[in-house]
A protein has these predicted regions:
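Metal-dependent de-N-acetylase/amidase catalytic core
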Residues: 1-8, 80, 89, 93-241
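Active-site rim/loop-helix segments in enzyme catalytic domains that contact anionic ligands
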Residues: 1-110
């Protein structure tokens, strides 16, 4: 795969993008490629760091997390972004056809060459929303290419590659670990990645884990090439080849 590419990242919650792929997305943008982000829930079932339970509503948290998400996305530099309103904490039980249709819509609108999402294990956390995001991204990847699927959502588009987040460290992904095929050097972007994560102030309870992962991974983000319609070699330092 050569030339300018479009890469779509599909995740479950505001802050997933900063935790996992911010450095890679920044690097792709600096190299002249187009990046897009689809987040499936507003994160309104989580906690609000520094505030007592009952002192805020789910809708107030959703609005605040949306502001944080937009601020982080501005730093990362996504050309296109969508924040959907499927149930946080209940994505696994959301209507599968409707959620898949939303993913298909995004793929057909932005026409990515590459789609990235969580692995089937849910990025090591076994979080049901993360696992559901993997399933919906996988379904959308396939359905978007079919003229028979969701014709009301636009013309078919066949993305070339599907990547899952991965890690070479067993402590990060204790079960169903995806072996990394690609290691992206993001050392140059770690400062901005930190800034993006720090936008998510409501989720500061995860701050220690974020910095532990950052240190352990040594200036790299890892991916597993799950589907390759482009038939390129694995083991690359770029998602594009």
């Amino acid at each position: 795969m050569t030339g300018v590419a479009t890469v779509l990242f599909v995740y479950a919650h505001p802050d997933d993008e900063s935790f996992g792929i911010a450095g890679t997305a920044m690097k792709l943008k600096d190299e002249g490629h187009t990046t897009a982000l689809l987040t499936l829930t507003r994160g309104d079932a989580g906690l609000w760091f520094g505030k007592e339970r009952g002192s805020w509503t789910a809708e107030e948290l959703a609005r605040e997390r949306a502001r944080e998400w937009h601020a982080a996305a501005d730093i990362i530099g996504f050309s296109e972004r969508r924040l959907l309103e499927w149930p946080d904490g209940g994505l696994w039980d959301a209507p599968p056809v409707r959620v898949t249709a939303d993913v298909v819509q995004m793929i057909r609108d932005v026409k990515p060459d590459i789609v990235c999402t969580f692995g089937p294990e849910g990025a090591g956390s076994e979080h049901d929303d993360h696992r559901a995001a993997n399933l919906f991204a996988l379904r959308g990847f396939h359905r978007a290419a079919s003229a028979e699927a969701f014709p009301e959502r636009g013309a078919p588009h066949e993305a070339r590659r599907l990547f899952f987040n991965a890690s070479p460290f067993a402590a990060d992904f204790p079960i169903l670990a995806m072996t990394p095929t690609h290691a992206i050097d993001i050392a140059k972007y770690e400062g901005r990645k930190k800034r993006a994560f720090e936008c998510h102030k409501t989720q500061a309870k995860d701050r220690d884990r974020f910095y532990q992962l950052l240190e352990r991974r040594g200036g790299r983000e890892f991916f597993h090439l799950a589907i390759d319609r482009a038939a390129g070699p694995a083991g690359s330092a770029s998602l594009l080849r």
